[in-house]
């Protein structure tokens, strides 16, 4: 932005019928700022997640979702919530009103959800039945039953994907054993990077740490 363009801005959602909703106001852009925007279709996201869950089930692999909810605090918890809702679709379709009344927000994960419905045996059982019918999940802690979708910030893509790649595409399952894993990354910045990395290692083999050296992570923080 030039000096003349610098100043406050707002983010506005314009609906198909022309209705405008201000999502955020007073966003400050000093001169020299590079501004970029993007959007994601919730319908396309849900369709993609449903397809990936189905493919994972068919392939007999673990389902895993890799996001960065610690940094992308607005977008990634919402995307995570869509994954929770899609994975437990029969539960949300059947008990939507009861879950809403209990204060369940899928963006907070399955762990928070289970805590809020712990006194409702019927819904608790429905969740277990739905999970049994879905592909097994990549686990954060197999011993404690903490899944990839329990807490949005438990699986951070910068750490989880390198670990999975290093393990040959295998992750920990609910049975406390390693299994081939479907890594779902609904992010067109991250996904191509890891896809290219995986293809490279398929061609060249694993890195030899004695000759490849190290790369320091300095920690670039976005505003």
Regions flagged by a language model, labelled:
Residues 1-81, 90-223:
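Extended, well-ordered protein cores
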């Amino acid at each position: 932005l030039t000096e003349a363009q610098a100043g406050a801005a707002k983010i506005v959602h314009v609906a198909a019928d022309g209705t405008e909703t201000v999502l955020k106001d007073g966003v400050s852009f000093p001169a020299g700022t590079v501004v970029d925007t993007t959007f994601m279709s919730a319908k396309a996201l849900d369709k993609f997640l449903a397809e990936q869950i189905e493919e994972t089930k068919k392939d007999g692999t673990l389902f895993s979702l890799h996001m960065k909810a610690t940094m992308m605090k607005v977008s990634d918890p919402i995307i995570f919530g869509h994954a929770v809702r899609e994975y437990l679709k029969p539960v949300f379709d059947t008990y939507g009103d009861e879950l809403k009344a209990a204060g369940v927000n899928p963006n907070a994960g399955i762990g928070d959800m289970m805590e809020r419905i712990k006194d409702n045996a019927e819904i608790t059982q429905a969740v277990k039945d739905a999970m049994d019918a879905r592909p097994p999940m990549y686990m954060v802690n197999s011993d404690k039953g903490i899944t990839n979708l329990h807490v949005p910030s438990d699986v951070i893509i910068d750490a989880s994907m390198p670990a999975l790649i290093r393990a040959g595409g295998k992750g920990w399952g609910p049975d406390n054993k390693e299994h081939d894993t479907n890594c779902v990354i609904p992010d067109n910045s991250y996904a191509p990077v890891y896809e290219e990395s995986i293809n490279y290692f398929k061609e060249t083999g694993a890195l030899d740490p004695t000759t490849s050296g190290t790369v320091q992570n300095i920690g670039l923080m976005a505003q």
